[in-house]
């Protein structure tokens, strides 16, 4: 495992240049957050106070939401298309009428934009806090924690022919 010393993500460019700055091709290797980050706020739809903790994760873990109750893991929900339970007003992972995590899109956008592959997220409610209503607070918090490049190589999907998606 390669460990970088808290690079300022916002001060670096993304893409191959980022790897050049650190001496590692971040496009080739998986990444995780360098240290734990905690954010608290209110769920925009439920109005409840919620805290999330973003934790480093091993290669090939992916993004995982750990639904917690009184400090105990109740359910693990992976951020996979197969886990999408609804998209009315927000993105819901899990069972919308049961255990789920809602309003994940701003956090997921920040993780994707910053190039993270593996993050374990502890959440003490069923909705990610809205914070400032964008991804900026997530980006700023992750920026403070830094990025860790893992030994596992990324896997890519190669699109071999045009794909067309239509509705209706």
Regions found by a protein language model. Name each.
Residues 2-117, 122-168:
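C-terminal regulatory domains involved in ligand/effector binding and gene-expression control
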């Amino acid at each position: 495992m390669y460990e970088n010393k808290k690079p300022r993500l916002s001060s670096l460019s993304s893409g191959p240049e980022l790897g050049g700055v650190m001496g590692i091709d971040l496009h080739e290797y998986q990444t995780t957050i360098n240290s734990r980050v905690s954010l608290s706020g209110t769920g925009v739809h439920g109005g409840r106070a919620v805290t999330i903790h973003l934790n480093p994760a091993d290669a090939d873990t992916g993004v995982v939401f750990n639904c917690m109750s009184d400090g105990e893991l109740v359910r693990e929900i992976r951020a996979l298309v197969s886990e999408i339970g609804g998209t009315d007003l927000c993105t819901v992972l899990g069972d919308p009428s049961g255990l789920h995590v809602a309003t994940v899109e701003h956090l997921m956008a920040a993780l994707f934009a910053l190039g993270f592959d593996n993050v374990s997220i502890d959440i003490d409610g069923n909705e990610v806090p809205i914070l400032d209503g964008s991804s900026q607070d997530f980006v700023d918090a992750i920026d403070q924690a830094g990025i860790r490049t893992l030994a596992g190589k990324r896997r890519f999907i190669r699109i071999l022919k045009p794909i067309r998606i239509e509705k209706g």
